[in-house]
Structures are given as C-alpha cells and as structure tokens.
C-alpha cells in the first residue's frame, strides 16, 4: 500500500539532507543524530527511505548495500522500495517521493547508487511534488566533499545506472492550484501562446479520443501529430487532391469526377479517400460524435474544420495503428515513426518535438482534463459509450424492413435508436399480446379489441379499426362462446 507522506514530514527529510550536504564520503558509515556523521552511497539511499517512512531505527543503521537491491533482500522491500515497472514512472499513476538508480558491479568501487527526491522545499513553502526533483548522492570526494545535494549529485536516471527503483510513497494531496492548459501546450510544442489557446480544444479532443492518458502518450502524440500537420497548421493537405481522383484503392470512383478533391487528405493526420472517410465516419458515429455512420462521406469538407483535426488523428492513432499507445508507453519513438511514416523521415524533428514535450512531465496531463471530474478521460469514455448505446442507430433485423437505398445505405425507416426500439417493441408486443389474449378468451383484453373496433381506442385510424374488427371476426368464427360471454357481461358489442 502506497505510503502517504505529509508535507511537514517531507520538509523534515529535506532539512535532514541539507544538514548533511557537504560531508565527506564515509564508506561503510551511517548517518546519526550528529549531522557531521556521514555515510556512503547505499547508506544514504537506504537511510533516506527510512526517513521518509518514519522509521525510528535509522540512527546509525545503514540497513544494507547496493547488493541488497540486486539480491532482492527483504530489508529493501521493508523500507518501501519497489522496482520500477517497464513503463517507468508514468506507469505508476503517481509521482513517488524518491527515485533510485543503481549500477551493479559486484559491490565495492564497481557498484554505485544515487537518488532523486521528487519533493522540493521552496522558499516560503509548502513542500510540493517536483517533476525534476532534487538529486541526493554520496560519492567519491571532490575538494573534500563527498555528500552532494542539488549541484554535484547524480540524478536517479544518470547514464551510469541501469537498475531503477522507487519508494512506494507519495506526498499528500495539497490545495488544487489552477494551471493554464494553453501555457502547458505552448511549452510542450513551442507554439505561441495565442495559437495554443486557439488549438487547445482540438488538441484536447484528439488526446482524449486517442486514449492518451499518460505523459508518454501525450508527448508522443504532440510530437508526431505536430510534425505531420506542419506544426498544427494543416487541417487539409496543401495539394488539390486531383491525384486521388481515380484511386479506386481508396474507394474513389474510376472516373474523373472530383472524388479526389472531395476526399483528399484532411485532419491533422490526413485521412484520405472515400473508404477512409467512411471508416472514420463509422468510428465517430460509434462514439456519438456524429449523427450518421456516413457523415463525412456526405459532408467531406467538414473534415477540414479545426474541431475535427485532433479527432481525425485519434482515429488513425487507435484504429489504423492500434499499437502506437503501447509503443508510446515504452518511449519507442523510432517504431512509432515507422508506423506513421513508413520509415524514419524527419526523425530529428520528431525527436526534437518529443523531447520538448517530455520535458513538461506530468503537467502534460493538464491537456486532457481540468478541475471538473467529468473531464477525466475514463469518465468521458464511459459517457460516450452510454451516449452511443442510447442514441446511436441500429439497423432493423426485420425481413419486412424497407429495401436499401441505391447507394447501399439504409433508409431512415430502417434505423432505430434504443428509445425508439423500446417504444417500437412496446407498440408491436402489446398489440400482439392483446389480440392473442382476446382470441384465448381473456375478456379483459377482448374489451380492448371491442373498444378499438368501435373507433374509441388510442389508434383511431381506419386501418387499425379494420384490424380490430378482423380480430373480432376471427374470434366469432373460431370461438363464438367468448363473444357470447362478453355480451352476457357487458351487453351488446
């Protein structure tokens, strides 16, 4: 269970570190209440974990060594350490208070460790979560100093290290502070602030629909889509589209009839061709985003509008290349580039964009939500699914349904929303129940048929009156005693 560290206690840990920074390196030593007593690399890491955990036995107790991590000693887990999962910090769902990197070389001078405190004490307080963190290390002495805090200390992810752990503890929640999502977008993409303000809704929609729910996915999406769309400028390809006019492999007609221009590349990922417009329409309809499953086939120019730019990219991201999010979780920039581009064209620009976005860290999550819990991507997905279940149309299964239109689409009379199906089922099912019950001698339901035959029922159309009279005629022919019983109880028909 993840330990919750109070801000006051985190401040105490920082004070303990600051008091010992500048000490000499002490191989085999341990920190004590005397701030001049010192320790080595593993003692520093293990005792700092004990400080965060509030253990009372830390004084003079170094707990173990770098080998304790390599050999999975129990004390490492007792202190609260866990090995980082393949997805890294992003896969945890929270920022731990401490991250650790290790070099394993059999102990002694060939092994080393350092850590980064992911809490930061700032002037005037309070302690807060930090995406960069404060590096904290005991190492070989430089000018008589072996214990470094901030400057001079290696970070947990220094290239020297190849084994990574975290302390399963996080800082307590603090007061919610407003974050300007447009500013975050500008920092993550290099866009001017005013452009970021204008693009934010389309970016947010695209990220949510693409299920980009962690910083790694968001950074990859911003980098790749930013490159593919000419820095988010192009919502339609710059060429006319005439080159696609007879591309039957894209679903366009073989004639030179303008299909190329109608269905040229649009959205930030350039959805191209009538077939792809149809596939995207069905996907968008299934999510409750458009009213019909052929919406963009009928209204292709709308796909050039900014509001669809990110959503179009999300369709490609999740449907056409469904492994991209998993690759993004692994930060596999090259493979994602191949999925989108077919090669590694302009990889340097994609990498530049990617690193720029990654540097923003967890604040990227601001782009997919706000203070409203309904902005949470999971909640929004549930809402879309519920909306789709209620209001998306399904085609009638009745063999008496109307024929399809000449273009293969369904007439509106064959399409039903859930509430329409319920009402339709009630309309057909109840009528059938009443008539069958009347034929079986149920005088209560026979009363309904008699009333309808007199033109006094809910449906007073000539067609339905004739239907009710036909039911009475069938009963009279097959079971006249039912009508006689009804007349005996109620009088003449």
Swiss-Prot record:
EC number(s) from the headed UniProt entry: 3.-.-.-
Gene3D superfamilies (alphabetical): 1.10.530.10
InterPro entries listed in its UniProt record: Cell_Wall_Dynamics_Protein, Lysozyme-like_dom_sf
UniProt keyword terms in alphabetical order: Antimicrobial, Bacteriolytic enzyme, Cytolysis, Host cell lysis by virus, Hydrolase, Viral release from host cell
Domain of life: Viruses
Disulfide bonds: none
One of the protein's GO biological processes: viral release from host cell by cytolysis
GO molecular function, one term: hydrolase activity
Enzymatic class: hydrolase
Protein family per UniProt: Belongs to the L5likevirus endolysin A protein family.
Function: Endolysin that degrades host peptidoglycans and participates with the holin protein in the sequential events which lead to the programmed host cell lysis releasing the mature viral particles. Once the holin has permeabilized the host cell membrane, the endolysin can reach the periplasm and break down the peptidoglycan layer.
Record-given protein name: Endolysin A
Native source species: Mycobacterium phage D29
Gene: 10
């Amino acid at each position: 269970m993840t330990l919750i560290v109070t801000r006051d206690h985190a401040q105490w840990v920082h004070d303990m570190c600051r008091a010992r920074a500048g000490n000499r390196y002490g191989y085999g030593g341990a920190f004590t209440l005397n701030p001049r007593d010192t320790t080595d690399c593993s003692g520093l890491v293990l005792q700092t974990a004990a400080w965060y955990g509030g253990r009372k036995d830390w004084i003079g107790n170094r707990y173990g060594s770098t080998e304790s991590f390599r050999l999975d000693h129990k004390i490492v887990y007792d202190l609260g350490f866990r090995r980082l999962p393949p997805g890294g910090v992003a896969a945890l769902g929270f920022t731990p208070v401490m991250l650790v990197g290790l070099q394993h070389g059999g102990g002694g001078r060939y092994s080393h460790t350092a850590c980064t405190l992911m809490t930061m004490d700032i002037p005037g307080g309070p302690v807060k979560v930090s995406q960069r963190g404060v590096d904290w290390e005991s190492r070989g002495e430089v000018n008589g100093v072996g214990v470094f805090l901030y400057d001079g200390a290696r970070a947990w992810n220094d290239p020297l290290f190849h084994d990574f752990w975290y302390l399963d503890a996080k800082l307590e929640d603090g007061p919610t502070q407003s974050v300007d999502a447009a500013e975050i977008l500008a920092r993550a993409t290099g866009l001017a602030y005013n452009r970021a303000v204008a693009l934010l809704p389309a970016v947010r929609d695209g990220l949510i629909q693409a299920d980009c729910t962690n910083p790694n996915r968001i950074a990859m999406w911003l980098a790749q889509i930013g490159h593919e769309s000419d820095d988010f400028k192009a919502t339609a390809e710059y060429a006319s589209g005439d080159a696609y006019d007879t591309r039957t492999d894209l679903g366009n007609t073989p004639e030179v009839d303008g299909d190329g221009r109608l269905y040229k590349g649009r959205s930030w990922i350039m959805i191209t061709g009538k077939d792809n417009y149809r596939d995207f329409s069905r996907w968008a309809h299934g999510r409750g985003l458009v009213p019909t499953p052929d919406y963009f086939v009928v209204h292709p120019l709308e796909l050039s509008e900014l509001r669809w730019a990110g959503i179009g990219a999300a369709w490609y991201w999740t449907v056409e290349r469904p492994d991209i999010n998993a690759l993004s979780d692994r930060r596999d920039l090259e493979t994602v580039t191949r999925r989108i581009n077919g090669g590694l064209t302009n990889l340097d620009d994609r990498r530049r964009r990617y690193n720029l976005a990654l540097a923003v860290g967890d604040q990227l999550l601001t782009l997919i939500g706000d203070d409203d819990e309904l902005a949470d991507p999971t909640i929004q997905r549930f809402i879309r699914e519920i909306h789709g279940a209620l209001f998306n149309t399904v085609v009638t299964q009745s063999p008496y349904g109307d024929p399809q239109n000449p273009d293969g689409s369904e007439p509106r009379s064959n399409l039903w929303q859930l509430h329409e199906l319920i009402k339709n089922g009630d309309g057909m099912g109840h009528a059938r129940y009443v008539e069958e019950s009347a034929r079986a001698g149920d005088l209560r339901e026979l009363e309904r048929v008699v009333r309808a035959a007199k033109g006094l029922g809910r449906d007073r159309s000539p067609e339905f009156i004739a239907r009710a009279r036909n039911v009475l005629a069938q009963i009279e022919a097959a079971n006249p005693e039912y009508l006689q019983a009804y007349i005996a109880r109620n009088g003449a028909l």
